[in-house]
Amino acid sequence: MPTRESIHYFGAGPAPLPTAVLEEASKVILNYNDSGVGIAEISHRSPEANAILANAKSGLRQLLDIPESEGPDGYEILFLHGGGSGEFSATVYHMVSVWVARQMKQLTESGVEEDKVVEKLREVLEKKMKLDYLVTGSWSLKASQEAARLVGSEHVNIVVDARKHRNGNKFGVIPAEDSWSQTQDETECALTYYCDNETVDGVEFQSTPSGHNLVADMSSNFLSRSINVRKHAAIFSGAQKNIGTTGITIAIISNKLLPPLTEMPDPKIMRKLGLPIGPIVLDWPTIAKNNSLYNTLPIFDVWIASKVMDRLLHSSSGSPRISTQEAESNKKATMLYSALDNSSGVYSVVPDKSVRSRMNICVRVKGGDADAEKAFLKGAESRGLMGLKGHRSVGGVRISNYNAVPVEAAEKLTRYLEEFAKEQQKGGANGSV
């Protein structure tokens, strides 16, 4: 029977977790802090749960240098349900509400009579409101489709569709910004949305894009490198890649988007405008007001995330605090890409070199030869290298290089990549090297 030590898992998510965290989790699930009650059993409103939540928030602020001011320069940290897909919707609900609130304020201050505000709002909405989406992979495409479903495609501006800039009409590049069709007027742009790392297509932004009211999905590269939070209106991440277990989503929201700095429009006004009103469990102001405890938060999942962050904090030695993990992520990715690039054509990396993801390395074996890829996967599994099959929508091989994948695992996989390539060059095809 395989042991945890004999298996190296490269699955795209849920992803591996640090063994030390899981070992501690196996104890607290039965008896938390010698209370005689398991952590999954304690009330989410108990002092113990509040301490776990506070520790998680504190750790995240330290790791990403998140401003804590109550003023316009500060950011709120939320723990939510619904995963990244839930936030596809939540970002639309909230950013459209913020846009409406700002338009209402502008109309009122310009002297429009109260009984005429909604009528004027409707005119402005129909003519001006745009949601900008940078479509660089499968997940940003899904997010843009959800926005179109909620508010209508006429309000969704596809700033760039990367498929149109590559042979084969497939994702794998991020065109230069001077080719983008962004909404120039900030008063018209409710949000600019991008996915920082596309797990299916192996594409990662190398720097923060420009745009008004910037919203980022960082689900698959969260806490793998330093980021400039201050450039963003909102950032969200599903926990199950780099930070914890499936069940929670973390959102970092600018105070400028929340009460009291922005008062949300009455739902009656949103209905009159024909705009969607989101479920209360996705409502950022409600979650923020209730310290992420409006409904039952899975405290065990928050505890896991806090322990992962504690490990990152204790292992860091530079500034920013995430720099140690960033260096390790880069080291593993460089090692793996080097083996792939020096395979004399046995492997072909799917995305363009300029946008290669450090987290999700998407590869074809012998140009996508089904037998060769099957042999590669079979040989990998026989060595305890698991979870390497590509996403069902694109096939191939995908190496997910998340934070908890140790350097030793990347080294073992690198050796196998080199061995398999040599065997293929000799004419072998059985993956039994």
Q: Where are the predicted features?
A:
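Active-site C-terminal subdomain of aminotransferase-like
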Residues: 239-337, 352
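Conserved active-site segment immediately N-terminal to the catalytic lysine
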Residues: 215, 229-240
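PLP-dependent enzyme catalytic core of the Aspartate aminotransferase-like
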Residues: 7, 382, 391-433
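Conserved N-terminal alpha-helix of the aminotransferase class I/II PLP-enzyme fold
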Residues: 35-90, 94, 106-117, 146
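Conserved PLP-binding catalytic core of the aspartate aminotransferase-like
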Residues: 347-380
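N-terminal "arm"/small-domain region of PLP-dependent enzymes with the aminotransferase-like
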Residues: 1-43
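Active-site phosphate-binding strand-loop segment of PLP-dependent enzymes
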Residues: 147, 158-222
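Conserved PLP-anchoring active-site segment centered on the Schiff-base-forming lysine
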Residues: 98-139
